[in-house]
Amino acid sequence: MKIVMLCDFYNESLEYQENLLVKYYVKHGHEVTVIASTFESVFDYYTDRHDKRVPPRTYFDQGAKIVKLRYRYNLMNRLRAYTRIDRLLEEEAPDLIYVHDIMLNLPECIAYVKQHSQCRMVMDYHADYSNSGRSALSLKLLHGVVRKWFLDRARPHLSRIFPIVPAGATFLHEIYKVPHAEMEVLPLGADVDLAREMRRRGEGRRLRSQMGFAADDIVIFTGGKLAPSKRTELLIEAVARLARLRLQLVVVGEASEAEAGYKQQLLELAKGRTNIRFVGWLGREDVYRQLDMADLAVFPASQSILWQQAIAAGLPLICGDTGHQDISYLNAESNIVILPRNEIRTDRLAQEIEAVAGQPERMHAMREGAARVAAEHLDWNRLIERTLRFNIPPPSFDDN
């Protein structure tokens, strides 16, 4: 099958949903083209620092063609579309168009689907009340009028809309008036193939030895973009309180320039504590090595793909729900301890870490539960079939 994906940002060194879709579509024999903007740096992307001088280019990643286009308009970094893709769609001749979020190039996709009845189109959706529509103007105008205008025209031609979390479906239903019947949650999966390969090769054991951790040390993984919303300072304080346990905390990730002060705050909190290590921003394979080494993952707040990656690596999770980021749909095997907003505190984190790390039987059961959840809900070998099923023709029945 020929698949064209539209996304605003693509960087081959990361493990975002787009990267994993590329990997697993190609693995299963599909031909993939990704259309994205000319953004290169994830930090520039999240701080809206777009350099319009960067030229368009085409290259290949994991067997997929990546086409990076300039924006033809970019209004306050909120409404932007890259140069028209009518001709590109005709050249690529996709069987499936996969749109990531409400892209303002949707009109070209709609026109293509209208002209090519065999082509299907699906869209995933990453926004919810926790990360979007934080002001009345944004909620009522940006989402409720402008983006809704584009989505309303696309909906008759979308085989399915895939919110990545249940809260996204609520947001679409309440703000965009999308019926629940048009949606189904498609979780952000993880690279289960890579996680299994790391385990098979013993990468975690090797890294554990390289970092000088003892066999009976309990290694805690945390990380992501180092920002105040992550509340990493609470975890550092909790680990400091649990000196009676043999804990080692590994912090993966980096801060943007705007949040360098927060990183400095974390470094000051960890100063003199040899059991707290900052290892910086890592590529995806190195992230999975760290996960394979760890015994437990703790994320005080602000959900990221690392949560799914940790489950894929078979780790018990302790995490905080700051609101509209309920992860209970991935807690089918009691593999996650979820702290509600009013309990995201140093003392509660310390209490739950001790309750899990201090009970080997419970930690083992949570690990086994995480492995089952990963196989059932986070394996892209299975998840991609949910996006492709609309192209499978119904069986024909011969009356004779």
What is each of the regions a protein language model found here?
Residues 1-53, 60-62, 240, 381, ...:
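N-terminal subdomain of nucleotide-sugar transferases
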Residues 4, 162, 214-230, 236-239, ...:
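Conserved donor-binding/catalytic core segment of Leloir-type glycosyltransferases
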Residues 38, 167, 189:
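Carbohydrate-associated surface elements
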Residues 40, 190, 223, 248-264, ...:
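Glycosyltransferase donor-sugar binding loop
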Residues 45-50, 54, 58, 206, ...:
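Short, structured helix-loop element that forms part of the nucleotide-activated donor/catalytic region
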Residues 107, 129, 141-161, 175:
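Membrane-proximal helix-turn-helix segments that form the acceptor-binding/catalytic region
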Residues 292-302, 315-316:
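Acidic donor-binding loop of glycosyltransferase active sites
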Residues 358-391:
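A charged, aromatic-enriched C-terminal amphipathic alpha-helix characteristic of glycosyltransferases
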